[in-house]
Amino acid sequence: MNINRKITLILSAILLFAAGTVQAALIPFQTFVGNYGVSTDGWGSTTQSGTISALVPAGATVVAAYLYSSTFNNSSLAGVGGTLAGQSINYDTNLGTIPAPACCELTATRADVTSIIKPLVDGGPGGVYNFDITETSSSQDGSALVLVYSDPTLGISTVGILDGYARVDGDTTSLNFSEPLDPSAPGFFAHMMLGIGFSCCNQASTVEVNGTLITESAGNNNDNADASLSNGNLITVGSFDDAFSPFMPGYEEDTERYSLVDYLSAGDSSISIRTTNASEDDNIFMAVFHVSGEAGVNEPPPGVTIPEPATLTLFALALFGLRRRLQS
């Protein structure tokens, strides 16, 4: 990497870091860089009992697994719980409640279920694994399962998990790379999966990628296991068995699973995704990214460090001066 390129990258990282200090509601939770894959799935039912699944290849090893529950009218999460594969779930992380003017105290919660899932998958035959799931509160609107696995046969990639709640005025996520992207390279991929709760009836959110609006229809209750929709099954998750959403899909076409490749250009060093809760009546509580290469999620890419906020301005000015001297 030449010095001009490195200075530009560090300056960009500083600006991204500063921008990231602005309040956001959908924030990075975990990032995995290496030979990783990810599976996502959703489920919802007013019966409060069903099946949620994961796709894991043979020979892979479970690194982490997280179970989310989306709720309504219960910001304290009173009585929220359940089981996964017959074991009790401790939902110990409240991901926050969407403030007014959004309705209904929309709140999601997360549990680490690695210790439950790992023994059931590691050393198994590979393929689709099904897990029994239950809920304990009528305020629970469904669940999402995110499973990250390592597989030495895979190339280097980045898995980023963000969670929280959907700001009415929008959230921006940046995936930042140390080298320019080449979307035309064989095997290049960039995938995004959203988890959205309390959504139906044309309630929708919007998604932009590097300034291109790719959907105004993110939402619906695609993972409802019941014959009809009702509070208690209004959830959709971009799942491993969903087709990728087409560009600007209709409400029924949007699967909340997206390939971002067509919205990238050769030479891009970041992927910027903006989600907006336009309806003020549903909750993007989770976003999962899986992209080729090494990336930082709302932070500089691996190997690039930035100073503490108190020294950002002086450091940036020094780098600008050095760059001008090199160009003169």
Regions picked out by a protein language model, each given a short descriptive name:
Residues 305-324:
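A short, hydrophobic C-terminal helix/tail in secreted or cell-surface proteins
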Residues 19-21:
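N-terminal signal peptide c-region/cleavage motif recognized by signal peptidases
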Residues 11-16, 318:
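Hydrophobic helical h-region of N-terminal Sec-dependent signal peptides
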Residues 25-303:
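Disulfide-rich extracellular domains of secreted proteins
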Residues 2-10:
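Bacterial N-terminal signal peptides that target proteins for export
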Residues 326-328:
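Membrane-interface capping segments at transmembrane-helix boundaries
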